Amino acid sequence: MTENYPEALATNASLIARTAIVVLGAGSGTRLKEKMPKAAVDVHGKTLLYWALERTRASGIAERLVVTVPPDCAHRCPQLLADAAEFDALVTEGGNTRTASVIAALDALAAKNPSIERVLIHDCARAFTPPQVFRTVAQALTVGHRAVIPVVPVIDTIKTVDAHGTVTGTPSRALMRAVQTPQGFRIDTLRAAHEHSRTLEASVAEQITDDAMAVEAYGERVHTVTGHTDAFKITTPLDLRIARALYPTAPESAGS
């Protein structure tokens, strides 16, 4: 899987003028076991949201940054609003689910920047994603793909099991990839996919865990590009310890 998109596309003025990046920061972070929303968790003097926005801005491919924050953020986590302001990001309150937060961000974009054609949806929990991953996803959108996700090879052997925990199969790792963010979409495709998700039976809809799955369910093809190991998701206390160990200061690769 090799990308040969013209590097000029990453800084083309018309590309920037029609692209937005949404950073999802409204998650509660329950599994992280911190006494604050995940986006507000500290990594060496800065919040996860700050680090995510730093990498996002360094990519240089978006006219507009949008941040979703938890309800009552002004009282519960004012630093998130300060971080968003530092990066001139549009702030909107997120919902109770990831999908609700994405839709809230798309609505805010439609009101503020109706000319946006492409949007990258990024998890704040993947705070140290290199800027080049954003550029690669954005570049793939410009050459005709309507949905693009960064992926990395699966390292572990994966087993499928039944309800009793008995192994039922071993999928080939050659055919499997771990999905990261940012996930990029033509904005009309993403909106249509989420509208379609509302028509699905609850048992089916609840299986959709990210935007790419919604687009798949809608029937649109999803293209993959190369992700990066630094784009790991900070979900558990162990993940947070790893992040603090790997990035004792501002990440040197923030601008790469």
Walk through the language-model features, giving the residues of each.
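SAM-dependent methyltransferases
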Residues: M1-V22, A26, A202, D210-A212, ...
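Conserved core of the sugar-phosphate nucleotidyltransferase
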Residues: T129-V225, S256
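Short phosphate-binding loop-to-helix
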Residues: A82-R118
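Conserved active-site beta-strand element of glycosyltransferases/polysaccharide synthases
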Residues: V222-T226, F232-T235
